[in-house]
Structures are given as C-alpha cells and as structure tokens.
C-alpha cells in the first residue's frame, strides 16, 4: 500500500489517544535489569483473554489506517509500505481466517512472534496480544518456529520481501526469518515486551533467541539484532495505536513503545560483533563520576571515542583523540547516564557511565 503521511491534525488525534495512564510508570525508577524487573511488576497480571478473542482484538488493534487507510488487516508479512498490497484481509469477515491454506493470500491467522512451542502453548502467553500478530497463514507457516535474524541468501521470499534462510550474523548460523525493514522495530519491541512480561518464566524456556536467564533473557547474538532493529526503526503511530487498543483489550501496555529509551537503559546499545579482543582491558573511571569528567585507560591507542545518550543521540564524537600514556579524558560532561563507545584497530567496545 502507498504510505499515508500523517497530517498535523491526524497526528494530534493519534497523540490524544496515546496518552499513557497517569502514574502508570511511576515505579520504573531504576536502570539495568532492576528497571526490567520494575516494568515486569507493572505489566504482569494482565487480563488474559481466550485465544479466539484475539480476532476481536484485531478489529481495533491491527487495522490499516496508516498506509492505504482502508481498514483491512495490517499484516507485517504482507504489507507493502510503498505500493499496493498483493492481497488484503478483512478484520470482520470470518471467512478470511485460516483454516487450510496453500498459498499466500488464502487466509490469515495468529502469529506468535515467540513461538508457542517455547512455552508449550500455556496461558497467558498463548493469547497475549502484545506478541501475537495477524499475519498471512502461508508466510506464518514458512516462518515456523525459526528465530528472527539477518538473511543474506534467502531460500524463500514472501511477496512483500520477508525472507527465510540461514542467519548471517555471528553467534547463530541456523535458519532464521527476516521481516522487512518497515517492521523490524515493531518485532523487536514485541519480543522485548515478551521477555519482560514473562521474566518469572523465561529462564526455563529453550530457544535460539533465549539464553536461559531471567535478566538478559536474550541470546547475545539475538539481543544485538533486536537492539539494532529497535534503533533503526523507531516507534511508529501504528505501534502507538496498537498499544492503546491492546491496553483496552487486556489491561497492560508495552513499555518499550511508551518509553523507547528504556531499551538502552536495560540492555545497553547494540554492539558490533567480533569486537572485544583489542579492547579487552579498557577501563573507564571514576564511574559514577561526581566531577563531570571521566578518564579512559587503554593499552591500545584509541581511534575514536563516542559519547552516546541512552536514546541513541551522539553527544560527542572525537576522532584520533590525544591520550597521555594511554589515558584519555572527557570533561564538562552534563549529568546523566551515557554510553562511551571506544574504537581501536577496527574493533569497538562500549561502557555505561553515570555522571552525577
């Protein structure tokens, strides 16, 4: 579908419906995995609905009022952001729902971004609308239970460009499924919600996307992909509208749509893979700093130092910095939480710092 850019009036309407309930995140005061646990306590205990009730939810949560604006099902596996869709489904016509299918365009069903087999189809995960999207049945079947990933040489491609093939990033080389760029951030935030909402259970589940812990929850390779997608594809009006509709439906919210900055506050920034040998011994001190200044000690001469805010904004970038016997100093830093990214010999590492 041809994308419709929101007018100032329509954006004001979207914003008016996007107000977070007063006080909803008042207890989200920490950082790191402490913040993640605080969010878990906020969003747990939602009003779990039946699996079949998802089709009722989709009538308000997943209608296309953002591309062709025709009210059909907005399916991330078939949507064509810059042109006409190959097929559409009605949110209210039961005959558009699967049953049997053989080809794309036959019917749509309910896609668990975290596969049901991971949690043995148990409630409330099996019907949690925040991670279950209406998608074409054929594409959903091709995605199967594979993790999401980066696919350079697909063995199968959907009509909108979603790809199935071997993952090409370091850490996992098995089959993976890659959605189109338009919806990568959406997928990332759904899955970050999932591992937060089910923090009390996720350590017991096995899948290539998970690492059997309750804190980080995600495998290192997959965490890096989700953080990259989150940064590259910011929260959209479609996600805001969906978050509000699901809040009405089941009584909890996706915090990473309401507060995208929480992602970096919990999991940090996406890091380049294969990047730590030359900088293994780098230290940043004092941390926290009470003097608006930090020092960096590195055995390797640094090629670049970048200071990044928690929402990904580059505050300072120093190329070929001057050090004194391996010590580099950043001064006059404003109060806040930051990431310091240091590069040397085509490698990089990142540290979180606090300026009081």
Task: Please name every model-derived segment.
Residues 89-92, 125, 129, 207, ...:
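Short, polar loop/linker segments at the starts of domains and inter-domain junctions
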Residues 1-22, 273, 313, 350:
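Bacterial Sec-dependent N-terminal signal peptides
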Residues 73, 81-107:
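Short, His- and charge-rich active-site/binding loops that engage polyanionic ligands
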Residues 7, 277-356:
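C-terminal outer-membrane/trafficking sorting elements
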């Amino acid at each position: 579908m041809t994308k419709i850019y929101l007018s100032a009036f329509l954006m004001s309407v979207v914003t008016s419906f996007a107000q977070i309930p007063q006080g909803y995140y008042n207890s989200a005061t920490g950082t790191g995995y402490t913040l993640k646990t605080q969010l878990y306590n906020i969003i747990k205990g939602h009003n779990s609905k039946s699996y079949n009730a998802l089709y009722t939810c989709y009538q308000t949560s997943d209608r296309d009022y953002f591309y062709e604006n025709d009210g059909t099902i907005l399916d991330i596996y078939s949507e064509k952001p810059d042109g006409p869709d190959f097929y559409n489904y009605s949110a209210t016509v039961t005959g558009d729902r699967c049953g049997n299918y053989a080809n794309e365009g036959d019917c749509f069903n309910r896609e668990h971004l975290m596969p049901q087999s991971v949690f043995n189809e148990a409630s409330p995960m099996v019907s949690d609308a925040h991670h279950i999207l209406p998608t074409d049945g054929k594409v959903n079947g091709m995605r199967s239970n594979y993790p999401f990933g980066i696919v350079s040489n697909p063995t199968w491609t959907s009509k909108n460009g979603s790809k199935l093939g071997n993952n090409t990033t370091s850490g996992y080389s098995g089959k993976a499924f890659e959605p189109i760029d338009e919806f990568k951030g959406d997928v990332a935030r759904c899955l970050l919600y999932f591992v937060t909402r089910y923090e009390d259970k996720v350590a017991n589940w096995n899948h290539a996307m998970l690492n059997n812990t309750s804190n980080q929850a995600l495998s290192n390779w997959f965490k890096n992909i989700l953080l990259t997608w989150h940064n590259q594809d910011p929260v959209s009006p479609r996600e805001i509208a969906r978050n509000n509709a699901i809040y009405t439906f089941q009584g909890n919210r996706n915090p990473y749509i309401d507060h995208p900055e929480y992602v970096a506050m919990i999991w940090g920034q996406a890091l380049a893979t294969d990047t730590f040998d030359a900088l293994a011994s780098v230290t940043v001190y004092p941390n926290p700093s009470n003097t608006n200044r930090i020092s960096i000690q590195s055995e390797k001469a640094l090629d670049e130092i970048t200071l990044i805010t928690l929402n990904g904004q580059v505050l300072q970038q120093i190329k070929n910095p001057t050090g004194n016997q391996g010590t580099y100093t950043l001064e006059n830093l404003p109060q806040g939480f930051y990431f310091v990214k240091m590069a040397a010999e085509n490698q990089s590492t990142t540290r979180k710092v606090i300026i009081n």
